[in-house]
């Protein structure tokens, strides 16, 4: 009888035979989310959301709390792993045309925005130098909004500068947003299972499906093992590899760091913001760097879903990946030549992908019809 139930359960989720390892990142993201919520809960128990005590409470967690250093480092490194997985997940969606499942893609983009907001609020909490100044710079962008900018910024800060009320509300938001992420993830997964996964060929999977368990579940288990092993290797040997040296000093509003920059996973957006000399223009470009993903399902022109059989589109896709990495690198450098021109060039290339790709689809259609 139990075997019958197991058979029924495994056959309830038939999955395309040929989906590759790139399809495993969804389950890895779910694992990252569970890890972040668990470690975050234990950190929240010992954390104090007060500008005089926040920095000391982090030191207290790492030094005095039993296994606190593991929790703190897992939470910080886990965030980087989360973003590595989500960027690969999005790249796979762009390459294999998964965005044509509109509900899944749009809910996923909203998930990305929520995740970025959560990570930003979390970066402010240790109240180190870079935490404070990154929060000052990013929240100050709200002042670029015509008419409403200044009152909006004052409302967000809870005063006329970043102070105790700001830290308290950022902690509250950092605590509540992961639950919004859980809800959005549930919607994302429900919408996915409504239509089913795409596959590397972009063809219909209905003709050849296999049970999710044991085939794909074992593939998931392998990738999760690699993820957790990598996480613990970083944790054991280079736990501060993703941290900024400035953040080991307590926040000082009177001393500005030589080069203010956010965490590495925001550097591509920060690089785009920095490459436009106008404040409002830069803010709009920053917002557009993520929200432009919402347009992708509506600008798909090719008859072929996946890029597997589209060499011209592949060229543009890999240019986008190289561009993304170059912007990230350029944003770590000071605002001076040649980094300014590199930032501006790569920003133009980044947005050009979303304009050129539909044109390439149209061109490929023409070539296919004539041949």
Curated annotation (Swiss-Prot):
Cofactor remark: Binds 2 heme b groups non-covalently.
Domain of life: Eukaryota
GO CC field: mitochondrial inner membrane; respiratory chain complex III
Subcellular location: Mitochondrion inner membrane
GO molecular function, one term: metal ion binding
Binding residues for heme b b566: 89, 188
Transmembrane annotation, as ranges: 25-45, 69-90, 105-125, 170-190, 218-238, 280-300, 312-332, 339-358
Residues binding heme b b562: 75, 174
One GO-annotated biological process of the protein: mitochondrial electron transport, ubiquinol to cytochrome c
Record's keyword terms, sorted: Electron transport, Heme, Iron, Membrane, Metal-binding, Mitochondrion, Mitochondrion inner membrane, Respiratory chain, Transmembrane, Transmembrane helix, Transport, Ubiquinone
Membrane topology, as annotated: Multi-pass membrane protein
Binding site for a ubiquinone: 193
Functional summary from the UniProt entry: Component of the ubiquinol-cytochrome c reductase complex (complex III or cytochrome b-c1 complex) that is part of the mitochondrial respiratory chain. The b-c1 complex mediates electron transfer from ubiquinol to cytochrome c. Contributes to the generation of a proton gradient across the mitochondrial membrane that is then used for ATP synthesis.
Extra facts: Heme 1 (or BL or b562) is low-potential and absorbs at about 562 nm, and heme 2 (or BH or b566) is high-potential and absorbs at about 566 nm.
Description of how the protein assembles with itself and partners: The cytochrome bc1 complex contains 3 respiratory subunits (MT-CYB, CYC1 and UQCRFS1), 2 core proteins (UQCRC1 and UQCRC2) and probably 6 low-molecular weight proteins.
PANTHER family registered for this protein in UniProt: CYTOCHROME B (PTHR19271:SF16)
Protein name (database record): Cytochrome b
């Amino acid at each position: 009888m139990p075997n019958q139930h197991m058979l029924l359960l495994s056959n309830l989720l038939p999955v395309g035979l040929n989906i590759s390892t790139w399809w495993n990142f969804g389950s890895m993201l779910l694992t990252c989310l569970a890890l972040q919520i668990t470690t975050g809960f234990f950190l929240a128990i010992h954390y104090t959301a007060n500008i005089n005590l926040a920095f000391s409470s982090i030191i207290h967690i790492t030094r005095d709390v039993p296994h606190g250093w593991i929790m703190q480092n897992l939470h910080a490194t886990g965030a980087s792993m989360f973003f590595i997985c989500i960027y690969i997940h999005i790249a796979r969606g762009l390459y294999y045309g998964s965005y044509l499942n509109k509900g899944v893609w749009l809910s996923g983009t909203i998930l990305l925005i929520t995740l970025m907001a959560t990570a930003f609020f979390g970066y402010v909490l240790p109240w180190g130098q870079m935490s404070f100044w990154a929060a000052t710079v990013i929240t100050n962008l709200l002042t670029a909004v015509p008419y409403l900018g200044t009152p909006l910024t004052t409302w967000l800060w809870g005063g006329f500068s970043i102070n105790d009320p700001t830290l308290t509300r950022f902690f509250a938001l950092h605590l509540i947003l992961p639950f919004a992420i859980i809800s959005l993830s549930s919607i994302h997964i429900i919408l996915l299972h409504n239509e089913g996964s795409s596959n590397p060929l972009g063809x219909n999977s209905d003709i050849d499906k296999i049970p999710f368990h044991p085939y794909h579940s074992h593939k998931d288990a392998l990738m999760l093992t690699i993820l957790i092993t990598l996480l613990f290797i970083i944790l054991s040997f280079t736990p501060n590899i993703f941290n900024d040296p400035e953040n080991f000093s307590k926040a000082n509003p009177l001393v500005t760091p030589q080069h203010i920059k956010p965490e590495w996973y925001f550097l591509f957006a920060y690089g785009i913001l920095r490459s436009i000399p106008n404040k409002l223009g830069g803010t709009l470009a920053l917002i557009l760097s993520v929200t432009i993903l919402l347009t992708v399902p509506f600008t798909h022109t090719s008859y072929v879903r996946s890029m597997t059989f589209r060499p011209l589109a592949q060229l543009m896709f890999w240019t986008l990946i190289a561009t993304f990495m170059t912007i990230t690198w350029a944003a770590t450098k000071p605002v001076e030549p040649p980094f300014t021109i590199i930032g501006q060039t790569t920003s133009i290339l980044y947005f050009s992908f979303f304009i050129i790709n539909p044109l390439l689809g149209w061109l490929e259609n023409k070539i296919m019809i004539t041949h």
